[in-house]
A protein has these predicted regions:
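Solvent-exposed coil/turn segments that connect beta secondary-structure elements
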Residues: 70, 97-99, 105-106, 138-142, ...
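A glycine-rich helix N-cap at a beta->alpha junction
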Residues: 194-212
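Bacterial N-terminal signal peptides that target proteins for export
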Residues: 1-9
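Small-aliphatic-rich amphipathic alpha-helix that forms the alpha element of a beta-alpha
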Residues: 46, 65, 92, 133-144, ...
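Bacterial N-terminal signal peptides
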Residues: 8-16
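N-terminal amphipathic, basic helical "cap/leader" segment at the start of enzyme domains
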Residues: 21-131
């Protein structure tokens, strides 16, 4: 295959990926659930980074990242992170340049909840608005038992901590940059994310290719 043909194929693939990521629903490709760096190496290389290249993540990488963060990893519907009593009350929102999407772990797809570039609203630091992906972690308290709801924030915080570490380890394995952040304005995000009174923003996490 000649170089011009290879370049043309690459351009078509990038165009298709960009078009897919502009859709109201993004059907993610099946995630890779094997391979990557050994766990101990990923732990050794895990770190927080605050300098990101603006390039969008390839759709396959986004798919693998979301599965690693909070995907279904067993036939019984259990996930890659633990929740108290398996309530699975944590929702993951992907804030991309073209819009905000809610991750559906069972169907492994993204559903758009808001169009437009809302990345600047996902955090106060300068790097947030230019990074290709900000993950926002939300607790849906309607899935939790009323009799123990007063104690549930700490349970949800533990679950979100596990998700964020999943993301860190995936990024270490794949050579991506990431940082988890408490600096996220949950009240400002409530409207674009369509969060009702039972939902609360817990943390956010910025992900992307490392700045050159």
């Amino acid at each position: 295959v000649t170089r011009p043909i290879r370049l043309a194929c690459l351009a078509l693939a990038l165009t298709a990926a960009a078009t897919a990521q502009d859709a109201a629903e993004i059907a993610l490709p099946a995630p890779h659930t094997t391979g990557g760096k050994p766990l101990l190496q990923a732990l050794r290389e895990r770190k927080s980074s605050r300098a990101f290249a603006p390039d969008p993540l390839p759709l396959a990488t986004l798919s693998d990242l979301l599965w690693a963060a909070a995907g279904v990893n067993r036939e019984d519907g259990h996930r890659t992170f633990p929740t108290a009593n398996n309530k699975q009350e944590i929702e993951v929102y992907a804030v991309l340049k073209q819009g905000v999407y809610l991750y559906d772990p069972k169907a492994h797809r993204l559903t758009r909840v808001a169009a437009g570039d809302l990345r600047a609203g996902a955090g106060g630091q300068d790097f947030v608005a230019g990074a290709p992906l900000n993950l926002v972690y939300v607790t849906d308290y309607s899935k939790t038992p009323a009799e123990s709801r007063a104690r549930w924030p700490i349970f949800s915080a533990a679950a979100v901590g596990a998700i964020s570490q999943n993301v860190y380890l995936f990024c270490a394995s794949q050579g991506l940059a990431a940082v988890v952040r408490a600096s996220v304005n949950g009240k400002a995000l409530a409207e674009p994310l369509r969060l009702g009174p039972d939902r609360e923003v817990v943390l956010a996490q910025t992900v992307g290719l490392p700045a050159k």
